[in-house]
């Protein structure tokens, strides 16, 4: 070790010395001595590494109290941070999908802070079933005989297959063997559920006789999978739920449908592309339908199964159900969300997902004009700022080919360098409330469809 290094190492204060400084004493009063000591030790280690690499102490060593304050803030920063979703994807999987309505947030908070009747029957003063009250609400909304709730739609599919088809064949069209995000594939789920995939038809065309020919002594289920994250167009043919349900009744085989997203609303009434509705599937004779809580429904993450009472009871009794069940916060939020569907006149304003999906392009453009006037003085030296029409997408595998007319503020670097644009995007992601846009065509796009608080955004971008 060189004499210069020895001098530098000697300038790193001891932990006890630092803890006795007024700044660190104040931090201990706020955060406790253990956490402050850990922060100081990590700073010491960082300083030693700097000496080893650069033969110099970091600049922050002039004030260890300030450095410790910053390190504590980093340590205690929430794992999930609030962001501005200006990506143009309404139901962004990586950003948490649906925003909960205020009533659902309040219901979840209420369930967290007090004892609730999660599995308690007030009438009988005995144990109840945690799905019961919500199941009744789902039955009223969908016309189902009963319902079952698990923690996501993948779990719903797994539970249906594991309960109804262990060791037996499940017949599915080859064109419906979907893969969703995270390499979640229907064939893999079938393997984990202990059943066998029986593919029928071709990628683009499947007929009723394909299903009929595949039925045999080992058949357990006929299954429909909604291709929610891709579309097959052109020379195509598919079997409807009503046709498949009639075939299932003929052979005594249950028919299940995985809607993926699913919607309790006729989206066409709101000027949006149509999405399959579980109540219509049940009316067509499908025995069980599964769909998500945190996509078009606009609630918390959950997998919802509705359909025949006898089959639902079998699902409830399966050992996997306990492993896949939802907690009280999820159930409280889901119940509050479903209550809004029983008051449809309030739905458009009360449900953030529906509000964002149906926001008029003219309203978004007006918002963009207001923001543009405020942002230009701060950024126009390095960037050209414009308001441009664009197309938002629904996201989370819902209506993959459909787009929503929107407007975005775009920033184009005057120096023409992509690095300038990337640096801006990096800087905005490092803000106290990160701003997430999208880089495309040499521009940074801020799609304003999902922006609810203009002033909060300006506070971040103009500070």
From Swiss-Prot:
One of its GO terms (biological process) is selenocysteine incorporation. Pathway: Aminoacyl-tRNA biosynthesis; selenocysteinyl-tRNA(Sec) biosynthesis; selenocysteinyl-tRNA(Sec) from L-seryl-tRNA(Sec) (bacterial route): step 1/1. GO terms for cellular component: cytoplasm. Its main location: cytoplasm. The modification N6-(pyridoxal phosphate)lysine is found at residue 295. GO terms for molecular function: L-seryl-tRNA(Sec) selenium transferase activity. It catalyses: L-seryl-tRNA(Sec) + selenophosphate + H(+) = L-selenocysteinyl-tRNA(Sec) + phosphate. Its cofactor is pyridoxal 5'-phosphate. Its EC number is 2.9.1.1. Keywords: Cytoplasm, Protein biosynthesis, Pyridoxal phosphate, Selenium, Transferase. InterPro entries: PyrdxlP-dep_Trfase, PyrdxlP-dep_Trfase_major, SelA-like, SelA_trans, SelA_trans_N_dom. It is found in: Cytoplasm. It holds the Pfam family Se-cys_synth_N. Homodecamer; pentamer of dimers. Binds only one seryl-tRNA(Sec) per dimer. Converts seryl-tRNA(Sec) to selenocysteinyl-tRNA(Sec) required for selenoprotein biosynthesis. Belongs to the SelA family. This is L-seryl-tRNA(Sec) selenium transferase.
